[in-house]
């Protein structure tokens, strides 16, 4: 057991005196003569092996050194955080408004309405930041890239030949799904195989070939050709195939005049000879004919897909361009109910609109207003808007509508 003499001899170094001892030791390090002789002798007698490099450093000096450095570090960190925040705002601007800059006008009739928000200079960013590394939080894939690489990536995704508009949707899960598909899965950069390219080329060739033949063989006759919108044929063909792969059993099409004859022959399989006979002056009506013009008539057929046959029908359509919309929706709902399709997945409605009529006909909005109701909902409709830039009211947008695009009213229903 330690004797009381030893205890008293070391009592001045107990923990209760630590603050006093540290202050005294700080003074000793600054100037040994500033402390009493007995304390100076005590500090001199300390084993220097316990002192780093044989010489201790004043804690006050260390604190002062870091204190002077702290504002610089804080300033640099704050600047980096602010820059990163500006980059996030730029990324979000591309996701929200990149479609305005997309190359959608091959004839260059209108200048794209490019907002300043798609320029990095709109934010607190400059040329010196282009080579700096920033975080690009792309859905589940978080990585660092230079600002220059981030901008080039966003331009490729959102400002190429396809525009994507989805940030008006209120459900975060849907927005995240789009971001993941476009950015993480790099959907816009998907490469087609040579077989797919050849197949699309053949479909385009069939569409253009029929259009040119009808134009030269029956000049001056109304036919509402597909010229300028030939890509509609491979698009519709792809939709039918993918609907079949997804388990759809029936597809109901509704469309107006533009490109209808081409769709009848090149997608739905109407015999060309039957179409040509309708152009001839000696065409005779039979009991199956209504006497209506050829570009009002419909047809139905079974089309083979990788998942089996899909029954596809194109309804008759009158001259009132969009009046077929609620007819198709009603037909689809009746078919779904008859099949017991409560998930609304076996019968798919596809409506093909003209650019002018889609924004001008009130029946479009009336049909949309019923889309989410319990009695008339069909689980969603695929809308295709055709604008070959030579149709009615397309020469000057200012004379056609009061919105930048014809589908602006779809945003009210959170449609993509």
For the regions a protein language model found, what residue spans apply to each?
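Hydrophobic alpha-helical scaffolding
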Residues: 11-14, 29, 76-80, 140-144, ...
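Active-site pocket-lining segments that scaffold enzyme catalytic pockets across diverse folds
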Residues: 214-273
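Cofactor-binding active-site loop characterized by glycine-rich and histidine/acidic residues
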Residues: 249-406
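Single conserved hydrophobic/aromatic residue that forms the stacking wall/gate
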Residues: 407-409, 414-416
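Short acidic (Asp/Glu) and glycine-rich catalytic loops that position anionic groups and cofactors
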Residues: 2-5, 17-22, 127-135, 215-219, ...
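Generic, well-ordered alpha-helical scaffold segments in large soluble proteins
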Residues: 23, 27, 31, 42-45, ...
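Subset of Sec-pathway N-terminal targeting signals
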Residues: 3-53
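Extended, charge-enriched "interface" segments that sit outside catalytic cores
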Residues: 9, 46-227, 231-232, 248
